[in-house]
């Protein structure tokens, strides 16, 4: 992962990169980093080079030069590129270049739901106006299939989350729906609002049984049969993922880099999380749902000051989403026109039963509003 630049032309309400500066990676630094990472990788290994900002396409010339360098120097290796963009700069020359490289360069779009939701979350830095109308959504859907839409839900747009998912999917995009992590979810009405939205999504996916679930609800429930491991992690931060800042310093991911942590990032230079275990005194360590929980070390650090301790409100949100996913998956299994369920279906139903019993405990009475069956 290369943090090509830190500057951005938007001022998103929830952005976790709160220490943005004008730092831009030089091509020489990029070459040095890439050479160190790629030199000893065998030709059969698939490698992904992720280019991120800020808004990455503010450094479009650098991106082109990086891709050109890697394609020439490492042409025998299986290397692909990925990038997430706010889309406002993807026009003209940028579109032509991306079209020409579409088989190896894959781009995700930050799109926060309906036009209103997106504009509420993602205004331009200079004008304060919404950025939705500056995005050529059709270009993305015509260039890649599928296209991931990173739909971030903020406290202000939570009450419209279901409509946002429906809109994104109606535009031919895959909804990678997540909750904003650069802020704390302390509004007392958030839980009740989320329950209402999950009910709507349950009904939506019941009416469209062939649709793939949005990321928020696309949960492998069978994973709860895996014994919780203290070294479990939802992503590869500090293990299979290395993030390099403009100076070429290595961090576990962008959430631990200077653009996010400022001076505190010095504590995580070269940090290796491969041997990290959750402390015994954290609720997550023995949680039955650890293997299906989308926890994030960087988000934990931002919210609680401890990479191993999740914000309590996120625990509640994640359990609600697991319950909603269980409801949808239960209905889909039971709708199958067969007299005998497969072994996989039986395992899923058993997982659902456990989720129901565990979440509907005296400690979670507020979840009774979302019946499983």
Task: Label every model-predicted segment.
Residues 116, 120-121, 175-194, 213-229, ...:
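Flexible glycine/acidic-rich beta-alpha junction loops that bind and position SAM and/or redox cofactors
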Residues 1-28:
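Canonical Radical SAM [4Fe-4S] cluster-binding loop centered on the CxxxCxxC motif
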Residues 34-50, 59-182, 186:
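Radical SAM/AdoMet-radical enzyme domain recognition
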Residues 285-373:
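Radical SAM enzyme core and accessory elements
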Residues 245:
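Short, acidic, Ser/Thr-enriched surface-loop or helix-capping motifs
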Residues 4, 8, 280-283, 289, ...:
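Short metal-coordination and nucleic-acid-contact micro-motifs, chiefly zinc-binding Cys/His arrays
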Residues 196-226, 249-295, 299:
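C-terminal accessory region of radical SAM enzymes
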Residues 235-239:
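Short, small/polar residue-rich loop motifs at catalytic or cofactor-binding pockets
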């Amino acid at each position: 992962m290369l943090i090509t630049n830190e500057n951005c032309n938007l001022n998103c309400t929830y952005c976790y990169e709160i220490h943005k500066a004008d730092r831009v990676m030089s091509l020489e630094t990029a070459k040095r980093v890439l050479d160190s990472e790629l030199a000893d990788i065998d030709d059969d290994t698939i490698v992904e080079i992720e280019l991120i900002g800020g808004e990455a396409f503010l450094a479009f010339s650098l991106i082109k030069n990086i891709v050109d360098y890697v394609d020439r120097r490492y042409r025998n290796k299986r290397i692909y590129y990925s990038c997430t963009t706010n889309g406002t700069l993807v026009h003209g020359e940028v579109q032509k270049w991306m079209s020409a490289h579409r088989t190896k360069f894959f781009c995700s779009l930050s799109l926060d739901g309906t036009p209103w939701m997106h504009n509420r979350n993602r205004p331009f830095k200079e004008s304060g106006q919404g950025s939705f109308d500056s995005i050529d959504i059709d270009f993305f859907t015509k260039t890649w299939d599928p296209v991931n839409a990173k739909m971030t839900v903020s406290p202000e747009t939570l009450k419209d989350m279901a409509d946002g998912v429906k809109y994104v999917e109606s535009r031919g995009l895959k909804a990678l729906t997540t909750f904003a992590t650069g802020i704390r979810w302390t509004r007392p009405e958030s839980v009740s609002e989320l329950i209402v939205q999950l009910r709507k999504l349950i009904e939506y996916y019941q009416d469209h049984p062939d649709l793939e679930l949005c990321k928020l609800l696309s949960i492998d429930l069978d994973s709860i049969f895996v014994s919780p491991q203290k070294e479990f992690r939802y992503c590869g931060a500090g293990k299979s993922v290395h993030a390099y800042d403009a100076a070429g310093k290595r961090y576990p991911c962008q959430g631990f880099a200077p653009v996010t942590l400022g001076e505190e990032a010095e504590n995580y230079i070269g940090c290796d999380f491969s041997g990290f275990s959750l402390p015994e005194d954290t609720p997550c360590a023995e949680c039955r749902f650890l293997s299906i929980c989308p926890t994030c070390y960087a988000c934990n650090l931002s919210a609680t000051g401890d990479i191993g301790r999740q914000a309590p409100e996120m625990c509640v949100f994640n359990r609600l989403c697991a319950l909603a996913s269980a409801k949808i998956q239960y209905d889909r299994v039971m709708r199958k026109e067969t007299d005998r369920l497969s072994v996989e279906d039986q395992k899923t139903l058993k997982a659902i039963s456990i989720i129901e019993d565990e979440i509907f405990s005296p400690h979670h009475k507020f979840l009774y509003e979302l019946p499983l069956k």
